[in-house]
């Protein structure tokens, strides 16, 4: 058999397989709303293990990090300062620990070393959320406004001033202690 005949046979087998699988596959569960009507916030909640729905009505700051990333660790002090400056009634910060060769022991040491016990951590054990958002490197930050729309994203380290600028642009109230 020549190469063209082999290729044609393989393509026919692949097409037959696709048709067969499509015929026996279970119907997909419909999303609550069409994707074009959903906010990025809702899509993340629906298709990943991170449920953002408890934070509806708040601005949400997701920071993706690993312990081996020096820029990520440098950001922690500024993230803590944002946490202390802005009202928890208006802002939810979630530190997304991407398990890129790490595990929960790394999270425990980061919490302790950077005094972040009060912050919310999400363990991205299988890097599912990192893949979903198209993470290209560390650190990375996503800022969602109070309506659940993506207000800003960065794939580089941010300073406190950069973070505060985003909070102010999303009209996040300052905490009583910071006023």
Protein language model features and the residues they cover:
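Bacterial N-terminal signal peptides that target proteins for export
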Residues: 2-14
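N-terminal "domain-start" segment that seeds a small globular fold
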Residues: 26-52
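Short active-site neighborhood of thiol/selenol oxidoreductases, capturing the structured segment around
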Residues: 52-73
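Active-site acidic short loop of glycosyltransferases
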Residues: 56-58, 88, 116, 135
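Structural microenvironment flanking redox-active thiols in thiol-disulfide oxidoreductases
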Residues: 73-114, 125-131
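Thiol/disulfide oxidoreductase modules built on the thioredoxin-like
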Residues: 113-117, 125-168
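Non-globular targeting/processing and membrane-anchoring segments
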Residues: 175-179
């Amino acid at each position: 058999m020549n190469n063209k005949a082999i290729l044609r046979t393989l393509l026919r087998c692949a097409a037959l397989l696709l048709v067969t699988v499509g015929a026996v596959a279970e119907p997909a569960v419909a999303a609550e709303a069409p994707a074009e009507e959903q906010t990025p916030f809702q899509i993340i909640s629906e298709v990943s293990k991170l449920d953002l729905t408890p934070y509806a009505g708040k601005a949400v700051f997701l920071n993706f990090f690993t312990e081996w990333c020096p820029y990520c660790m440098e950001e922690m002090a500024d993230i803590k300062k944002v946490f202390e400056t802005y009202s928890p009634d208006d802002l939810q910060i979630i530190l997304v620990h991407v398990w890129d060769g790490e595990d929960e022991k790394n999270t425990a040491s980061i919490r302790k070393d950077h005094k972040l016990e009060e912050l919310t951590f999400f363990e991205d054990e299988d890097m599912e959320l990192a893949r979903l958002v198209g993470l290209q490197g560390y650190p990375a930050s996503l800022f969602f406004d109070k309506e659940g729309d993506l207000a800003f994203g960065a794939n580089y380290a941010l300073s406190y001033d950069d973070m505060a600028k985003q909070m102010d642009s999303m009209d996040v109230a300052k905490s009583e202690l910071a006023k």
